[in-house]
């Protein structure tokens, strides 16, 4: 398994406020739409972007965008909030969220450096239309003190089942915390998906390049630790892992009904089994399939019974 099988997704978030406008906590009128129009105009030069206004958005579309991480819960509660999303969903810009402009950039695997180049180019284009609040000493001014400075958070989502199963994750988290890097589970404790987000905590006093470097070092450390833990796991628990991964893959291919939580947990065990060669399937293709079978995505597709439809599609695609 390559590093990109452990590193699932990279994300860069840039938080900005606009000169001459109140911060979102006080911007509760149609002036937020003026900002949205300016940002959309800057992005629309390249085409392929769609503007969504929260007040005019259907519940199904709102849930789908939220499920895919393209908008936040906070934005959905903003009556003057908007989102501008690229057709391939690799770029999402939220307007009137915690800050006036919150840019999100997504990429597969560990690709922070390339993603930052893309983010910088688009941020510069937006900056030509909207003058950002910038202090010569402090940097970008944001609503939350944790974002002041670069206004940038760089994160990578990692699949770390062996570190979790061997109880080694906490010690790894402690070691990278010295770099002001946090590790947080993507899901709550009730879901055993073994997905964790690695993110910088410091935005002030560091350049964007230094942040990318620090997060990259933490990610590399965790990938090496996961690879070592997988070798140890095979030595200590091969029969248990083989059995659980084969059962998981068998259920994915044969169940009549399946919840989204069960699907995620089974996929993660099947993916670990694929790493060891216990089962054989295209994990990347399956990951795309699973994204299309989350609750809001299925509701948008108009399926009568969500769990029956999910299991039917898994049987169809995996057999």
Q: Where do the PLM segments sit?
A:
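Short glycine-/aliphatic-rich beta-strand segments at the starts of folded cytosolic domains
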Residues: 154-160
């Amino acid at each position: 398994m390559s590093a990109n099988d452990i590193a699932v997704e990279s994300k860069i978030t840039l938080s900005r406020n606009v000169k001459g406008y109140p911060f979102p906590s006080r911007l509760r009128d149609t002036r937020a739409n003026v900002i949205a129009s300016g940002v959309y105009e800057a992005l629309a030069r390249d085409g392929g972007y769609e503007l969504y206004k929260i007040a005019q958005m259907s519940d199904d579309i709102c849930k789908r965008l939220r499920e895919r991480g393209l908008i936040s819960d906070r934005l959905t509660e903003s009556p003057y909030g908007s989102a501008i999303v690229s057709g391939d969903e690799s770029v999402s810009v939220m307007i009137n969220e915690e800050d006036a402009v919150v840019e999100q950039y997504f990429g597969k695997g560990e690709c922070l450096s390339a993603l930052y180049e893309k983010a910088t180019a688009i941020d510069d284009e937006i900056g030509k239309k909207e003058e950002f609040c910038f202090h010569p000493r402090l940097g970008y001014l944001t609503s939350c003190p944790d974002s002041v400075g670069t206004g940038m958070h760089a994160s990578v989502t990692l699949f770390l089942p062996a570190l979790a199963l061997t109880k080694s994750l906490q010690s790894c988290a402690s070691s990278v915390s010295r770099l002001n890097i946090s590790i947080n589970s993507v899901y709550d404790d009730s879901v055993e998906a073994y997905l964790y987000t690695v993110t910088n905590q410091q935005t002030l006093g560091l350049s964007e390049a230094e942040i990318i470097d620090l997060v990259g070092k933490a990610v590399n450390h965790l990938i090496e630790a996961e690879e070592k833990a997988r070798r140890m796991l095979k030595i200590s628990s091969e029969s248990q892992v083989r059995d659980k991964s084969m059962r998981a893959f068998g259920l994915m291919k044969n169940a009549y009904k399946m919840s989204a939580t069960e699907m995620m947990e089974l996929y993660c065990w099947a993916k670990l089994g694929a790493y060891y060669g216990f089962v054989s399937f295209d994990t990347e293709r399956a990951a795309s399939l699973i994204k299309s079978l989350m609750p809001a995505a299925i509701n948008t597709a108009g399926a009568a019974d969500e769990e029956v439809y999910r299991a039917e599609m898994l049987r169809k695609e995996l057999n």
